[in-house]
Amino acid sequence: MKMNYPIEYYKEKMKFLRDNSERYILPITCLCLTSVVITSCLFAALFVAVRDCKRDSFLEDTTTAITTSSSIATTYRDNLVIHCPRDWISHNGICLLSTGEKVGFRQGIQKCEKLGSDMIGKSEEEMKALKNIWTGNDHSRFWVDNRAAASTFDPVNECAYGTRSSVSEVPKVLTSPCSVRRYLVCKKTDNSYPTTQSSFYNQYE
């Protein structure tokens, strides 16, 4: 059975609903705005994280590429066989010339200088090519290329030379009077034109 309410009842009902709806409008609005702000912050943080990840990945790839290129360049340099003048022999990035004659220390320096080169100095690679040839150190603790001598000897009237009896033997640095004549080897560097590998050791086996 349908009930008929007086008009005042409906007016009170509408007033109640209007008053209560106004009470919740502000909290609901604040909640919506807060949700929008939080969502925006999350998206911003996600964007920054992805960007940093891509940047770090790019930097890592770039660093790896640079390191690899540097390693390749170093390997190529260390194994470089260069173009040398006629009668000179390429050996690990330097040109070597064995004159086949025995000379004193000072005479050896002069002969190499006339050829636009230096007398072979003391280094691990260069020592591998030595058998009984002058390497420097005239009255001082410095080699002919001005590097400090690491050996413990203190020559007064002697000069240093490299010697070994075979290719497999570790080269030794000894001293003898500078006037003693020994085989001379000059060196120069010219990395302009790579060429084919050749062996320096065979001359002294």
Curated annotation (Swiss-Prot):
Superkingdom per UniProt: Viruses
Transmembrane feature ranges: none
Alphabetical keyword list: Lectin
GO molecular function: carbohydrate binding
Ranges for domain C-type lectin: 84-187
UniProt name for this protein: Putative C-type lectin protein FPV001/FPV260
Organism for this UniProt entry: Fowlpox virus (strain NVSL) (FPV)
